[in-house]
């Protein structure tokens, strides 16, 4: 990405996390959606970006890593401790960053697309990268707006609403919630 104000070249890379041990949908990252593995959609979208210079795939699954090799992207073998149900995405990203630093891979900015959110427009990555640099943000994420819903959460066997139950607004007047994609 070239920032027109400073003529400074930015090295933007993508780190895609795709673990193999999903318990909900077995091998979900390799399940075909419209004749393409789920992970393939995100890889191809990153490849179409004008600004992403390198794509790195982090996984504990050799099958997923082999797919990355087939797609001609860089791979990082993720240790199992960063690939459990309880491991955070942040711990896996930090492992990937450490791997890149050890390999002396230079980058300024990381795009961290979710493989499980494959429905993106052709220019979504590039549009987001442009906004990120032009607004001088330190981070940026996409989200979906949830409107017209009463949301509850369960805390120690109690249900807690997202509204004041003594003054329940009509659903049309509820402030929208933002759900990170």
Regions found by a protein language model. Name each.
Residues 1-10, 70-72, 102, 130, ...:
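Asparagine-rich low-complexity intrinsically disordered tracts
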Residues 8-26:
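N-terminal nucleotide-binding beta1-loop-alpha1 segment
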Residues 12-13, 53, 108, 138-140:
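Conserved acidic residues
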Residues 19, 80, 114, 144-145:
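Histidine-centered beta-alpha loop that forms part of the nucleotide-sugar donor binding/catalytic region
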Residues 38-54, 66-67:
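A short, N-terminal amphipathic alpha-helix
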Residues 55-59, 142-143:
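Short internal beta-strands
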Residues 56, 62-111, 119-123, 127:
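Short phosphate-binding loop-to-helix
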Residues 91, 95, 109, 115-181:
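Conserved core of the sugar-phosphate nucleotidyltransferase
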